[in-house]
């Protein structure tokens, strides 16, 4: 069963833009990504749906990319908070990313022809001064 049909069957797609084009794109190997917040060394239940979507896409022959928001995670999400978030140290961030990487390895295959990739936005954003 094509991945798009499976996702519809499971009730995981409410609506999409240009379903015909999407179906054509997903008929060949493509890259999909989901982002994860490394403000803790472990994923939480809110990460389960995007993680399972990455797994399903990988099982269908696509390459999953797990984007860890290391730069944005250092700053934190202030929504719903009255106090300013404390910046994470680079050491804490690295430990959190490593913990998440290990957990992702239980769901995603990081070897093989459509190996999952883990990227960290800290790697390309660390030189920007707004993180200082």
Report each predicted region and the residues it spans.
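NTP-dependent nucleotidyl-transfer catalytic core
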Residues: 1-132
């Amino acid at each position: 069963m094509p991945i798009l049909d499976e996702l519809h069957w499971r009730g995981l797609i409410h609506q999409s833009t240009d379903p015909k084009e999407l179906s054509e794109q997903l008929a060949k190997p493509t890259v999909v990504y989901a982002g994860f917040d490394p403000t803790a060394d472990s994923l939480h239940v809110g990460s389960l749906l995007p993680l399972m979507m990455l797994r399903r896409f990988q099982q269908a022959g696509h390459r999953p990319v797990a984007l860890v928001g290391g730069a944005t995670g250092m700053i934190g999400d202030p929504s719903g908070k009255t106090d300013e978030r404390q910046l994470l140290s680079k050491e804490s961030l690295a430990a959190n990313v490593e913990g998440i990487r290990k957990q992702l390895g239980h769901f995603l295959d990081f070897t093989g022809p459509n190996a999952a990739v883990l990227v960290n936005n800290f790697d390309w954003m660390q030189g920007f001064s707004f993180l200082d």
